[in-house]
């Protein structure tokens, strides 16, 4: 995953999290998993 792709993922996940209250507890967990995964 490139830095640009990662940035898009992060933005999309946060935006989606704002729109759905049931998603706010779920999506940040995915975001953390993606963010803490080392890129090669």
From Swiss-Prot:
It comes from the Eukaryota. Its main location: cytoplasm. Keywords: Cytoplasm, Peroxisome. Residues 1-10 have a biased composition (Polar residues). It is found in: Cytoplasm, Cytosol; Peroxisome matrix. GO terms for biological process: regulation of lysine biosynthetic process via aminoadipic acid. Disruption phenotype: Decreases the level of LYS1 protein. Coiled coil: none annotated. GO terms for cellular component: cytosol; peroxisomal matrix. Residues 1-20 are annotated as: Disordered. Modulates the lysine biosynthesis pathway, possibly by stabilizing the lysine biosynthesis LYS1 protein in lysine-deplete conditions. This is Peroxisomal LYS1 stabilizing protein 1.
